[in-house]
């Protein structure tokens, strides 16, 4: 999706998203609901109601709470943003199914842990649970034959990390 979005708008930023509007976003497969959420988020940033730069100065919990105040952003999306975009070191998206299954596989559990169980399992990995999440995601994808060899020419600045 990111590649399609980038092809549509060029530099993915709030102004360019607003410039495409709903029709542009829908033309690349963004659902009506997600288009509304994206455009509302872009509008919040452009209007100054949301300053994403200030999230860096907050705790993980406060930054997550601020993001989740926005319509369409739940815990998974907030955690993914904090982990991938802001690179907070102690984010562990316990609601992520691949992370739940991957953790069960990596630590040898018979059942897939629920989010509250996964939170407890991740405590020993503090304060670098984001690194643990990336390792577990990689193991999850590798077990399923979905890890592609690294491309040394890839533009790492614009390729979002995390599972496909």
Task: Enumerate the predicted regions with their spans.
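C-terminal accessory module of base-excision DNA glycosylases/AP lyases that mediates lesion recognition
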Residues: 36, 56, 60, 75-164
């Amino acid at each position: 999706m990111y590649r399609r979005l980038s092809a549509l708008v060029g530099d993915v930023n709030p102004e360019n998203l607003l410039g495409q509007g709903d029709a542009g976003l829908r033309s690349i497969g963004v659902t009506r609901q997600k288009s509304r959420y994206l455009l509302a988020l872009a509008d919040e940033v452009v209007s100054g109601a949301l300053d994403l730069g200030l999230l860096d100065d907050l705790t993980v919990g406060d930054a997550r709470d601020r993001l989740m105040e926005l319509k369409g952003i739940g815990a998974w999306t907030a955690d993914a943003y904090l982990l991938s975009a802001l690179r907070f070191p102690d984010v562990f998206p316990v609601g992520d199914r691949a992370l739940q299954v991957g953790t069960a596989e990596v630590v040898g559990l018979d059942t897939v842990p629920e989010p509250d169980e996964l939170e407890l399992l991740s405590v020993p990995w503090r304060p670098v649970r984001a690194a643990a999440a990336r390792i577990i995601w990689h193991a999850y994808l590798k077990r399923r034959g979905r890890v592609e060899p690294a491309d040394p020419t890839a533009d790492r600045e614009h390729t979002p990390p995390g599972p496909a």
